[in-house]
Amino acid sequence: MKLQINGEARDFDSPLTLAGLVDHLGMKADRVAIELNRGIVARDQWPQTNLAEGDRLEIVHFVGGG
């Protein structure tokens, strides 16, 4: 399955959920926000949000500082 993540085309095995994608990419769920096809998806919806061929995702990492 081809997905576009932050403007880059990537191939993944399907089926895949948003939670599975975050895990696969080695990201910490509490430190990212995800936009799927131009809509923000709440973190509690990630486990039941299935991804499909051609989906476009923007993943934003939160960085602390001060």
Predicted stretch roles:
Residues M1-G65:
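Ubiquitin-like/PB1-type beta-grasp interaction modules and other compact soluble beta-rich domains
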